[in-house]
């Protein structure tokens, strides 16, 4: 379950997704082996019922609620369900050895990520993002810092609990113990290099929980220092903090709109865009418009589940997450502190939007349930009854890995030609549509290529599909341009206004409106837009912004 972490993780179809599915399929084979070789099966627990209820709700949501291209999202849910069942069979067979293998695997994966990070900082390997020096195998430093924080918490907790006992044993045991200590030490400079406040907050919470019983006074002093540091960090990056606050408020508003069943799997982006438009519609001139954006992910895991799945998904997620954390902490599992770091990080970031972190989450929940439920001897025919379920699940997940590998290949081919606007590539885009129809950058590029070819209606159809999987108003702006060239002035005006309403911090839709009114001879409206552009305070000044303002000033002086 740690293997997907060390593979390349992207914001689009990635190798880590492929290997994540294959790891689950391999886990299913191990589960079948455990059923054959062992005489015991895990006892059922009420948490198994909660997990089953959640999986059924997700399946019904996908079939009856979601109008979005959510096959990939549901595929992940199915793979996670198979992984949970397989782990519930494997963990009792392995016994206490599994817990040791689990934290050792986390530390080993963390060691690889640390090595990659140091190589990037030293310039020996390329970072995965052009704006940041260190990203590990991830596409930006945010999720990378979260995983490093998870490993830091686990390694420090192990050394704090067991390090001294192991340091005096045989040579290889001492080597292992000091290797864990080295992993913990090297996590610190990497975390500093990522500049991730979320990771540091999560580590601080885990440290407070680890030290609370023995060093309560020190923890209280540390909490005071942390509050002061938090205030300083807020003013240091106030815009980013205000942006997270806005995303939380808007996501909460989106959830409230469909509180029971949610908007459907894969529907977070469109629901967020509509909620943000409604938010600013009643708060014209709000200072938060400057920090508004178009997030691809929910920066709060609970709200993300709530928006897509409603209460029927959010409640099981909270119950399983918090209950498993309590169980692991009560039983003294050192990996529990890594689970705590991941849960805290999910309140401010998007780890659960990525396959590697979902794999880790399922493993922690399955471990907690297995420790609580125990196992019992059963007759051979009961053990064999488990075979078809696990075998079919493993086969389905392996097929998912093949489909995902095809999507990865299609996206790589698309990325190689995306900068070339040529009619000759339209047929290639059309062939890749079924594999990439859930990815906004592909849909926008396809829509732009169709527009360049003069096929405005087809372009709008593709861009309209993009609005279902993205909350970026650029889709509406380009649709407005298509409507304008088709002579549909009212539709163009509506598209431009919607683009500005979704993101009032961008001036370009106002500029397009001004040019539309000017071309149609509606000079009063054009001058009104021009005055609005002149008074507009952009978040970032640029030559393009200054040019649009100059055109607006010229129009008002006519």
Where are these regions (language model features)?
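Alpha-helical transmembrane segments of multi-pass inner-membrane proteins
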Residues: 4-6, 22-34, 52-64, 72-89, ...
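Structural marker of alpha-solenoid helical repeat scaffolds
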Residues: 435, 468-469, 502, 536
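Alpha-solenoid helical repeat scaffolds
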Residues: 441-445, 474-478, 507-512, 542-547
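Register position in tetratricopeptide repeats
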Residues: 452, 485, 519-520, 554
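Interfacial juxtamembrane loops and adjacent helix segments
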Residues: 125-132, 265-308
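Transmembrane signal-anchor hairpin modules in multi-pass inner-membrane enzymes, especially those
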Residues: 1-63, 67-72, 78-108, 158-181, ...
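Hydrophobic/aromatic packing residues within the alpha-helices of TPR/SEL1-like helical repeat arrays
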Residues: 426-430, 463, 496, 530
């Amino acid at each position: 379950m740690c293997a997907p972490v060390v593979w390349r993780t992207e914001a689009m179809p990635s190798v880590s997704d492929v290997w994540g599915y294959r790891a689950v399929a391999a886990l299913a084979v191990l589960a079948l082996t455990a059923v054959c070789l062992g005489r015991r099966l895990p006892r059922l627990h009420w948490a198994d019922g909660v997990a089953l209820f959640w999986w059924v709700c997700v399946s019904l949501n996908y079939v009856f609620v979601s109008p979005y291209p959510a096959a990939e999202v549901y595929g992940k849910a199915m793979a996670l369900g198979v992984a949970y069942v397989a782990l519930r069979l494997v963990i009792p067979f392995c016994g206490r050895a599994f817990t040791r293998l689990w934290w050792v695997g986390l530390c080993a994966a963390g060691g690889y990520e640390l090595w990659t990070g140091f190589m990037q900082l030293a310039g020996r390997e390329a970072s995965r993002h052009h704006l940041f020096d260190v990203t590990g195998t991830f596409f930006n430093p945010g999720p990378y810092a979260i995983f490093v924080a998870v490993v830091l918490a686990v390694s420090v907790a192990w050394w704090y609990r067991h390090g001294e006992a192991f340091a005096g044993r045989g040579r290889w045991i001492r080597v292992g113990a000091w290797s864990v200590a080295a992993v913990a030490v090297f996590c610190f400079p990497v975390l500093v290099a990522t500049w991730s406040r979320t990771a540091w907050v999560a580590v601080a919470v885990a440290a407070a929980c680890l030290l609370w019983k023995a060093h309560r006074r020190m923890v209280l002093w540390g909490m005071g220092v942390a509050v002061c540091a938090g205030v300083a960090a807020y003013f240091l990056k106030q815009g980013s903090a205000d942006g997270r606050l806005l995303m939380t408020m808007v996501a909460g508003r989106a959830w409230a709109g469909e509180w029971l069943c949610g908007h459907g799997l894969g529907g977070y982006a469109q629901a967020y865009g509509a909620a943000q438009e409604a938010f600013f519609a009643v708060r014209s001139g709000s200072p938060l418009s400057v920090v508004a954006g178009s997030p691809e992910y929910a920066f709060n895991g609970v709200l993300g589940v709530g928006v897509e799945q409603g209460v029927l998904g959010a409640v099981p997620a909270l119950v399983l997450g918090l209950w498993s954390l309590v169980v692991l902490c009560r039983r003294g599992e050192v990996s529990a502190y890594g689970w705590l770091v991941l849960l805290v990080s999910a309140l401010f970031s998007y780890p659960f939007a990525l396959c590697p972190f979902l794999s880790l989450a399922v493993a922690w929940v399955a471990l907690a349930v297995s420790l609580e439920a125990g196992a019992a001897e059963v007759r051979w025919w009961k053990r064999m009854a488990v075979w078809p379920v696990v075998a079919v699940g493993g086969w389905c997940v392996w097929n998912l890995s093949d489909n995902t590998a095809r999507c990865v290949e299609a996206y790589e081919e698309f990325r190689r030609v995306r900068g070339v606007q040529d009619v000759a590539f339209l047929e290639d885009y059309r062939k890749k549509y079924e594999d990439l129809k859930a990815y906004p950058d592909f849909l926008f590029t396809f829509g732009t290529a169709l527009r360049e070819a003069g096929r405005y209606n087809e372009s709008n159809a593709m861009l309209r599909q993009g609005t279902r999987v993205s909350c970026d108003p650029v889709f509406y702006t380009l649709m407005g341009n298509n409507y304008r060239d088709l002579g549909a002035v009212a539709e163009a005006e509506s598209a431009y206004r919607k683009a500005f309403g979704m993101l009032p911090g961008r001036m370009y839709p106002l500029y397009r409106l001004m040019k539309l009114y000017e071309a149609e001879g509606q000079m009063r409206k054009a001058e009104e837009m021009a005055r609005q552009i002149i008074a507009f305070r952009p978040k970032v000044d640029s030559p393009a912004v200054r040019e649009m303002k100059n055109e607006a000033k010229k129009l008002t002086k006519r």
